[in-house]
Amino acid sequence: MAKHLFTSESVSEGHPDKIADQISDAVLDAILQQDPKARVACETYVKTGMVLVGGEITTSAWVDIEEITRNTVREIGYVHSDMGFDANSCAVLSAIGKQSPDINQGVDRADPLEQGAGDQGLMFGYATNETDVLMPAPITYAHRLVQRQAEVRKNGTLPWLRPDAKSQVTFQYDDGKIVGIDAVVLSTQHAEDIDQKSLQEAVMEEIIKPILPSEWLNTSTKFFINPTGRFVIGGPMGDCGLTGRKIIVDTYGGMARHGGGAFSGKDPSKVDRSAAYAARYVAKNIVAAGLADRCEIQVSYAIGVAEPTSIMVETFGTEKVPAEQLILLVREFFDLRPYGLIQMLDLLHPIYKETAAYGHFGRENFPWEKIDKAQLLRDAAGLK
């Protein structure tokens, strides 16, 4: 492969779509804490002064959706009306129904291992050895920039920062290997009284330089810090937010394909979420085992059917064993039936709110990031 550029973006926890994702997953977590077998599909809409939480939830649990919503918005940092959104005074509306019994009869089974998929669909998982977390570098560093923005906002280092922010990083590749960073974009909401020059200097020193490796930066690297010159109006006052609208930010930043299904607000019976996590787990273990430098997994399902309708392994010419052998290894070591992958990754716990900002992949505390099958795969493949 010749020289090329590749760009990924991320958004902060205060971005309107991410507020919605975090509320949906906070509701999911609260329900799973009481009822691990609950069926949850929770969607959220946010706009100036209001939050609407809707969807289909079937559970024995009772949760206070208004309190969960306000606490989530408060933790993000929207606590004053001058930000255009206030956790203490915003309206919280609820429109929750129950899961269709037609769907339910296709999912539940007397034998849990025969649990059917909650819907048809296709999901992808990906891993690459270009970073220590086996994720693409562009999305990894885009996430780290907005995470750092939240950190220095909350710890008081840059008290004039506000919750809404976006990042974008363009990497230079030569023959598939990173040779540098071509461009960095960071836009952050801010208080009215900070001037542009002071903001740009502070963002460079406190956010960008501590995060991006200096060996990838050079005199030709371009930096765009609040390029419009002003970002006071942000969050839900600037744009409405919806659950599930940042699916590329949530996954691989465009480096891998995406099946189209969003994650947040969905319990693990929804393969949109759980099978995408399992596909990442498979791909990461294949790369960690040294069986390939890059690996993309596709799985697909039919509603009400336990066995996947297809499994694909793509290694982009980087495989160390034949592709046919990789498929056999995946089938041998990973149970990709809906209940099997729930058990394999221990998914019936309230672990989802943390996934809802800064990416679902590449953070070691999530169970689908374990590489506990890597040595087994390596041994079975006959690699020394």
Curated annotation (Swiss-Prot):
Main localization of the protein described in the UniProt heading: cytoplasm
InterPro entries according to UniProt: ADOMET_SYNTHASE_CS (IPR022631), S-AdoMet_synt_C (IPR022630), S-AdoMet_synt_central (IPR022629), S-AdoMet_synt_N (IPR022628), S-AdoMet_synthetase (IPR002133), S-AdoMet_synthetase_sfam (IPR022636)
Catalytic activity: L-methionine + ATP + H2O = S-adenosyl-L-methionine + phosphate + diphosphate
Gene3D superfamilies reported for this sequence: 3.30.300.10
Necessary cofactors: Mg(2+); K(+)
Record GO biological process: one-carbon metabolic process; S-adenosylmethionine biosynthetic process
Entry binding sites for L-methionine: E56, Q99, D239, K270
Keywords: ATP-binding, Cytoplasm, Magnesium, Metal-binding, Nucleotide-binding, One-carbon metabolism, Potassium, Transferase
Region (Flexible loop): 99-109
EC number(s) on file: 2.5.1.6
Binding site for ATP: H15, D164, A165, K166, R230, F231, D239, R245, K246, A262, K266
GO molecular function, a single term: methionine adenosyltransferase activity
Cofactor, free-text remark: Binds 2 divalent ions per subunit.
Compartments reported by the entry: Cytoplasm
Pathway in which the depicted protein is active: Amino-acid biosynthesis; S-adenosyl-L-methionine biosynthesis; S-adenosyl-L-methionine from L-methionine: step 1/1
Annotated binding of K(+), by residue: E43
UniProt xrefs under SUPFAM superfamilies: S-adenosylmethionine synthetase
Any one cellular-component term (Gene Ontology): cytoplasm
Described function: Catalyzes the formation of S-adenosylmethionine (AdoMet) from methionine and ATP. The overall synthetic reaction is composed of two sequential steps, AdoMet formation and the subsequent tripolyphosphate hydrolysis which occurs prior to release of AdoMet from the enzyme.
Subunit structure: Homotetramer; dimer of dimers.
Protein name: S-adenosylmethionine synthase
Organism: Salmonella dublin (strain CT_02021853)
